[in-house]
Structures are given as C-alpha cells and as structure tokens.
C-alpha cells in the first residue's frame, strides 16, 4: 500500500491541462480544532499537481511547493483539489491548485514547480 492509497483518491480528468482529485472525509483527517489537517490538504494538492505535471510522458519531480491556507474545511463529504497547468516549459512545469470542500469555497491554494528530467 502506497502513501497515497491511504487517502482513497479518486481522479477526474477535465482536459490535458486540468484535473480534479477528491478524497472522502475521514475522522482521522481532523486536527485539534476539528478542521481538516493542513498536511492532508497539502498532500491532496501535491498529488493533484504531481499527477498533472507527470501526465505528459515525462518524469517531473517537485522543485518547490507554496501553499496558502485561506479557511478551514470543517464539514464536507469530500475534499477536492483542482490542479491546472499555469506554464509548461521544456524544463519547468508550473501548476496551480485549489483545495475546497463540498461548499466549493476555496480553503487553500498552492503553486508547485516541477523539474522535467526525462521521458518515462
């Protein structure tokens, strides 16, 4: 079982430049104040961004990731991450991601840069 398997991730491909991942709510994801833990939010954003960046037949490991937490997710049947290509260069792929709950209010945003290293 991989780390990502723990989250029961489901994927919806919108187009070659956009995808959405979702995970079902689990009590295990809550922090001490009863909101979804920031680590879960960042993991989902990282997976969505990474899946998208690595979908072009290239190996593209993460160079950097910046996350901004905007509001807590308190109650939600699912947690979603929508990743979109901002720029796809020959050496760097930049992906923006928004994380939100069922209410569609943005809880966090991230920008991740990936280094295109080689073909798969």
Task: Please annotate each region the language model reported.
Residues 1-120:
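Terminal targeting signals and extreme-terminal segments of soluble enzymes
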């Amino acid at each position: 079982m991989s780390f990502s398997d723990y989250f029961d991730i489901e994927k919806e491909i919108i187009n070659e430049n956009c995808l959405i991942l979702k995970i079902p709510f689990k009590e295990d994801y809550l922090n001490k104040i009863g909101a979804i833990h920031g680590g879960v939010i960042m993991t989902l954003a990282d997976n969505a961004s990474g899946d998208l960046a690595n979908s072009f037949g290239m190996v593209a490991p993460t160079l950097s990731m910046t996350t901004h937490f905007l509001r807590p997710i308190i109650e939600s049947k699912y947690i979603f991450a929508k990743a979109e290509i901002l720029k796809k260069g020959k050496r760097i792929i930049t992906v923006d991601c928004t994380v939100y709950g069922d209410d569609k209010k943005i809880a966090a945003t991230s920008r991740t840069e990936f280094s295109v290293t080689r073909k798969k």
